[in-house]
Amino acid sequence: MFRERIIVQDSLVADESGSAFRIRLPWYRALPLSTIEELSVTVDGTAFDPARLRIAVNDGEWALAEAQLRTDDVWFVLDDATVRLPGLVLDAGAHEVQATLSMRIPYLPVAGKPLSMAETDQKRMDVKELTA
């Protein structure tokens, strides 16, 4: 729905432990984290293992599989989530980041099942050093 808004422009940060960037919910209403079906990330043409990425929303941070079990943690429309890529050390300069986010919309049934939507966004961003 709002695919061009998924990746927050100029949010790519990195240090010796890995990289991170922020994403936004591509829907017009808040959704529980358990509605995330897929989150895949590619940096400079190389896919990052989804089992290793972490997502931080509100005051919590989880592996993707853990986040998909969080029925009481809600991702609000105006709040960015941080996608952490542990071990992905990036050099200074510009990098091509692509994210595909697939969400299940539980209150919109289609053919007896919840609506499923997948959106992909790609941005070229300069990496910034992660500060404490």
From Swiss-Prot:
GO terms for molecular function: lyase activity. Its EC number is 4.1.99.28. Pfam families: CGDB. It catalyses: 3'-dehydrocarminate + H(+) = kermesate + 1,5-anhydro-D-erythro-hex-1-en-3-ulose. It comes from the Bacteria. Disulfide bonds: none annotated. Activity is strongly reduced in the presence of chelating agents. Belongs to the C-glycoside deglycosidase beta subunit family. Heterodimer composed of an alpha subunit (CarB) and a beta subunit (CarC). This is 3'-dehydrocarminate deglycosidase beta subunit.
